[in-house]
Amino acid sequence: PLLNFSLERSPLPGQMHPGLNLGNKVLDIFIHLARLAKKDGLLAFPAYFHNALLFSRAFHFFNPKKQGEILAIRKSLFHIPFKQMAWIVHLNCLKDKEGRIYEWKAEEMVFSINKALRKYFGSRAYKEKVKKTQERLKFDIDWICYKKRIEKEGLEKLP
């Protein structure tokens, strides 16, 4: 908590201090504890879009449409660096194909430990809903919005 951000290490939305890069180790500990306690899984509620992206390495949205939405954003913005993508969404500068502003709304994400949850996320029905949603959604960046908002927020050093 004593470190400050720098040009090389700028903040993500909501971040007050640079991270410690312990996310994977902490997740491993939580998974181990959940298994010891014979829990069905772990639940995450990503307050920020970038948290959902980070969690998506191991977690799935319980709602397959939300899973498809995140995959569609990643596909639409595949060429954008992670941190910049996080700020684009946070500053409301992402638009869908109809020109509506995309607004991040958190939903439950699950890390499956038991067989029933793994079966749910691996099911044809879940995967089809994810795929249909992903194919239906397209997103574009409003670069004018982004440039204005990073200036207004004093974040000019962001990419």
Predicted regions and their residues:
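Intrinsically disordered, low-complexity, charge-dense segments enriched in Lys/Arg
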Residues: 70-159
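Acyl-donor binding region in acyl/amide transferases
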Residues: 1-60, 65-76
